[in-house]
Amino acid sequence: MKWLVILGLVALSECLVIIPLTKVKSIRENLREKDLLLNFLKEHPYNMIQKFGLKGSLCSPKISCLRLWNYLDMVYVGNITIGTPPQLFSVIFDTASSDLWVPSNQCHSRACVTHRSFNPTLSSTFQSSNRTVKLAPHSGLVSGLLGYDTVQIGRFKSENQAFGLSQSEPVKELENAFFDGVLGLGYPSLAIQGTTPVFDNLRKQGQIPEPVFALYLSTNTKKGSVLMIGGVDNNFFTGNLKWVPLSARNYWQITLDRITWRGVVVGCTRGCQAILDSGSAFLLGPSRQISSIQKIIQARFIENEYQVRCCARTTLADFIFTINNVQYPVPARAYIRKGSTPRRCYSNFSGGTESLGKEETWILGEVFLRLYFTVFDRGQNRIGLRIAV
């Protein structure tokens, strides 16, 4: 897996902003090439669904909690600016969180000094709240302050925008990250209490023509992928979008009918929930079902990862995800990824979502989003899907 990083700030149309994206290496691939991945996974057990269901009990009543999680396989990053004059940052555009955070110049952790940091004294529009925030990733507690300033994405400006400024980042994987922070595109219910997410602020301030954004992930791994804000460019898909109503308004959550392989139901047997997550590279589900799927594709657990024969990418059948009575095939070339060496391939399925609650839940990450152009419609609380061109 690799990171998508912005090439240029924006390409403007009359009504929407289109942000071009391309790929660089993921933290996982970076560690693998340095022969550090195996030891890292042993020392830091990897929980891919850490960010979902984060409880406020992790922090005291006087401290706000901002969602933070594992970044080993995060996929989408792009450039924004904060402050006046603007300070540039590369951030993850994440649909499963709602906060914005970047490192502060007061952070001296190794993960901070290897990335861009925000200097409040250089911005004439910065306002401090003197409010502490705690970010709770799996391998350490990141602390910081809540501030307010002007945030710009393309030509859209969010005035007096709340964001977290990390002052300590004792999180090992962040040292190898190709991004500085996170910009969440989820619902306000996921945000720090008393704050407004960037997208909602832009909407309230009349910056966005339409309350929608969309993701197109090109099959060309190096170029062509884009994030659209404020509208939809029909050139990135064919036919009509298939609309799916949200089943909850926090994550971009929908109802999933079933998952089948060669006509046999292998997951979501009685209907379940699915979260579309641009901040995840994988297809995540309950461990029991995932274990069965790994056996189906003959994946073997080697060196803390599920490895698959590379020839299976062209021989195995599609998994069919049925959503709102529409079938969405996921072929083997998508659910089995190539490794950094020709003979190494890996499963893009992973378990652990049973910890989210009693109801069966699946996470549809890059594997799914790369196949289907996706519109996130806040105006009508729905998601639009169509085969990407």
From Swiss-Prot:
It is found in: Secreted, Extracellular space. The keyword Protease applies. Residues 76-386 form the Peptidase A1 domain. Keywords: Aspartyl protease, Disulfide bond, Glycoprotein, Hydrolase, Protease, Secreted, Signal, Zymogen. Its EC number is 3.4.23.-. One of its GO terms (cellular component) is extracellular region. It is an enzyme of class 3 (hydrolase). One of its GO terms (biological process) is proteolysis. GO terms for molecular function: aspartic-type endopeptidase activity. Residues 1-15 form the signal peptide. Coiled coil: none annotated. It comes from the Eukaryota. The active site is at 94, 277. Expressed throughout the chorion, with the signal localized exclusively over the trophectoderm. InterPro entries: Aspartic_peptidase_A1 (IPR001461), Aspartic_peptidase_AS (IPR001969), Aspartic_peptidase_N (IPR012848), PEPTIDASE_A1 (IPR033121), Peptidase_aspartic_dom_sf (IPR021109). Appears to be proteolytically inactive. Belongs to the peptidase A1 family. This is Pregnancy-associated glycoprotein 1.
